[in-house]
Amino acid sequence: RYPAYLKKNGTIGFVAPSFGCATEPYKSAFESALAAFHEMGYQTMLGPNCYAAEGIGISNTPQKCAAELQQMYENPENNILLSCGGGELMCEILPYIDWEAIKKAPPK
């Protein structure tokens, strides 16, 4: 299975399954990227952890990061899903993902 191409006026969903964009220079760079996507005609949808700084080196607890990823992946309102930053601690969320639900959802 492959995701559909992102169409003009499509919606890009952003999540923070590891470190997000709560601090500089990541916050400014992310906001510049969001502005560029809007200028190109895309809509954006941000997960609740994109600007969170609740964990140590991770945007929130592994459970909350997994819930964000799960909800955004299953949300039909966004067409593609991107991480807003980080990745080093994403492996901590894996036990909390419902892989059967991910398999059933359209690919992103």
Residue spans of the language-model regions?
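Long, contiguous hydrophobic alpha-helical segments, chiefly transmembrane helices and signal peptides
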Residues: V15, E88-M90, K108
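Short linear functional motifs in flexible/disordered or boundary regions
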Residues: E24-Y26, L81, I93, A105
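ATP/NTP phosphate-donor binding region
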Residues: R1-E77
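Short, acidic/small-residue loops that bind anionic groups at enzyme active sites
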Residues: I97-K108
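Long, hydrophobic/aromatic-enriched structural stretches that serve as scaffold segments
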Residues: A66-A67, Q71-I97
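Short, glycine/charged-enriched secondary-structure capping and boundary segments
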Residues: K27-A29, P95-D98
